[in-house]
């Protein structure tokens, strides 16, 4: 993952206020551990799984996230794309940021895949351009390529 992406993830965590999650900090013991799974809700294409992993790494390097489906993989509802294990408090603090990246990027990848399929057999080609959401270009362009 390039430096720009790592810095943008750091900024996203700051913006989300992960260090000020008073609900989690007050209700979840710092010793409580959690094991969980990322389960697909709709047929699509995985994108951003590496970004989600980096989110948790930045919060706590002790969080273990095993990627079961790589970026660019077609998935169906109910598929498990990753598992996660670590301090519950830290996983909950990063959950929203990780899922936001994962959902946005997977949505872009799935939509791109549909257009690529529609254009199969023609001379047309899907390109990723500079027309992206502010500050998200590095992630959105990756999603198109996935």
Locate each region found by the language model.
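Acidic/glycine-rich phosphate/pyrophosphate-binding loops and surrounding catalytic core
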Residues: 2-146
């Amino acid at each position: 993952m390039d430096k720009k992406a790592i810095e943008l993830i750091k900024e996203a965590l700051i913006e989300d206020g992960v260090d000020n999650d008073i609900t989690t900090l007050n209700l979840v013991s710092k010793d409580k551990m959690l094991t969980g799974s990322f389960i697909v809700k709709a047929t699509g294409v995985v994108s951003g799984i590496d970004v989600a992993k980096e989110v948790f790494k930045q919060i706590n390097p002790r969080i273990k996230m095993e990627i079961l489906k790589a970026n660019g993989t077609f998935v169906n509802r109910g598929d498990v794309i990753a598992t996660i294990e670590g301090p519950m408090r830290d996983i909950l603090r990063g959950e929203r940021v990780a899922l936001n990246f994962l959902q946005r990027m997977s949505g872009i990848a799935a939509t791109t895949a549909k257009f690529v399929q529609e254009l199969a057999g023609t001379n047309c080609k899907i390109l990723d351009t500079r027309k992206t959401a502010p500050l998200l270009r590095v992630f959105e362009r990756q999603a198109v390529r996935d």
